[in-house]
């Protein structure tokens, strides 16, 4: 009798599990994400003179533009902006962060190098070597390599040259 009761209980549990679970469909788009990117390619010359050295800033920053969960989108963008530009920019929108970062990079370049360049130009030893040391370049390119319900892979390629012999390259 006991064996029959256990078998009947197992059969009842299996049947009820089958009937009640059929109405529970999984929403495969629960965390649907769409990505976009913002691109900047800006070249700024010292003193605004195209004959003088320049800095070149190239940005291609991917960010979450749409999501079924706004909090997910916001937290991803916070992380992306922090990883690309630093913690100072993580509370901004992607558009605002790119604009502020571009302004700061160009402003710092001109403020830091124009006085030194002017002094070197007055001392003028070798025109070509002076120009090479004052030419700067920075590139930050990010993109989403993989995005599914379990994994998001975000890659950032960073390179920078600030005069001298070698630049910096990281991924």
Q: For the regions a protein language model found, what residue spans apply to each?
A:
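Generic short beta-strand segments
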Residues: 155-161
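Bacterial signal peptide processing site
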Residues: 23-26
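Bacterial N-terminal signal peptides that target proteins for export
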Residues: 1-9
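C-terminal motif of bacterial Sec signal peptides marking the signal peptidase cleavage site
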Residues: 18-21
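Short helix-loop boundary/capping segments
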Residues: 170-171
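Active-site acidic/histidine clusters and adjacent loop/turn architecture
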Residues: 31-150
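Short, solvent-exposed beta-strand/turn "edge" segments of beta-rich domains on protein surfaces
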Residues: 145, 163-166
